[in-house]
UniProtKB/Swiss-Prot annotation:
Function: Catalyzes oxygen-dependent 5-hydroxyuridine (ho5U) modification at position 34 in tRNAs.
Gene: trhO
Keyword annotations from UniProtKB, A to Z: Oxidoreductase, tRNA processing
Keyword Chloroplast among UniProt keywords: no
SMART domains: RHOD (SM00450)
Species this protein is from: Psychromonas ingrahamii (strain DSM 17664 / CCUG 51855 / 37)
GO molecular function, one term: oxidoreductase activity, acting on paired donors, with incorporation or reduction of molecular oxygen
Entry EC number(s): 1.14.-.-
Active site: 177
Family under the similarity heading: Belongs to the TrhO family.
Protein name: tRNA uridine(34) hydroxylase
Cleaved signal peptide residues: none
HAMAP family according to UniProt: TrhO
Length: 328
């Protein structure tokens, strides 16, 4: 049974003292062995973390003890192993980066649509369905009839809207993303640009996969996630994709058969873009990861830091014992 809870969370709310929250939040996560990354900004909090059921409950309770975060949006899935190596709390200008000043989802945003009502909305021929995620995310799964903006990052989305959408033509626009947070900003942006009927999938794709039976689903493929699982299927279980360590893009078992694929180094998508030095560095890293696994250790992440410190202390103890023995 999968016993690690993966929890995606966010909340757009004014956090004037967000910088002061960083240290106690990080300490709290470390004390409860929670891994993952949370972003703090004046506009709110966002991130994905993983840990035991008890520890995740403790974290959520801690966050919601702040009245500003008591309506925190959370979505959960489950996995065998923790998909994160490190524990981080970062300070940011935005909790999801669009790069447009003045966009405030707290003030204006699109209409939320529950997962159970989503199929009916996107089946309306008058509705333009837009996937707000990046091209590499869309490549492994999306909703039937969704438009792919072909953006490589969320900063490119406003330009896509300016070049391709028109309030006079696109009377009804529905948008979706992985967990809902990007759509908070994308729908707010469209409203600011004069679009009237703007909708977005409440809770994102992850909530849809959780609540809509697979036999009724209009989702096609798998859903990309930003952790070591790479993708999840309709049951929210780890999907069939792995990740290239050279370019961080999803790859299939067939992709690994390419003569341009080298485990831990590169794939057919980045083989020509990486320098010789980069490939050598990645190959050395992969070698160290393999050696660490043979020793039953971790090469990267918080555990690796602890192991290095433990090894250092052991060496000190050995040297001290040798000095004591030499004096006899």
């Amino acid at each position: 049974m999968s016993n690690t809870v993966v929890c995606a969370l966010y909340r757009f709310v004014s956090l004037e003292n967000y910088q002061e929250i960083q240290a106690p939040l990080l300490k709290m996560m470390q004390a409860n062995n929670i891994k993952g990354t949370l972003l703090l900004a004046q506009e709110g909090i966002n991130g994905t973390v993983a840990g035991s059921r008890e520890d995740i409950n403790t974290l959520i309770a801690w966050l919601k003890s702040d009245p500003r975060l008591n309506k925190l949006t959370t979505k959960e899935s489950f996995t065998e192993e923790n998909p994160f190596y490190r524990t981080k709390v970062k300070l940011k200008k935005e909790i999801v980066t669009m790069g447009v000043e003045g966009i405030d989802p707290k003030r204006t945003a699109g209409s939320y649509v529950k997962p159970k009502d989503w199929n009916a909305l996107i089946s309306d021929p008058d509705v333009l369905l837009v996937d707000t995620r990046n091209d590499y995310e869309i490549s492994i799964g999306t909703f039937k009839n969704a438009v792919d903006p072909k953006t490589t990052n969320f900063r490119e989305f406003p330009q896509y809207v300016k070049d391709n959408l028109d309030p006079a033509v696109n009377k009804k626009v529905a948008m979706f993303c992985t967990g809902g947070i990007r759509c908070e900003k994308s729908t707010a942006y469209l409203k600011e640009q004069g679009f009237d009927e703007v909708y977005h999938l409440e809770g994102g794709v992850l909530k849809y996969l959780e609540e809509v039976p697979q036999e009724e689903s209009m989702w096609q493929g798998e859903c990309f996630v930003f952790d070591n699982r790479v993708s999840v299927n309709h049951k929210l279980e780890k999907g069939q994709y792995d990740q290239c360590h050279g370019c961080r893009l999803p790859i299939t078992e067939d992709d690994k058969k390419s003569d341009k694929y080298q485990e831990g180094v590169c794939c057919h998508q980045c083989h020509e873009q990486l320098t010789v030095e980069q490939k050598q560095r990645f190959a050395q890293r992969e070698k160290q990861v393999g050696l660490a696994k043979q020793r039953g250790q971790t090469h990267i992440g918080n555990d690796a830091v602890a192991q290095l410190e433990n090894n250092r202390l052991k060496k000190q103890a050995v040297k001290q014992a040798q000095r004591v023995e030499a004096k006899k």
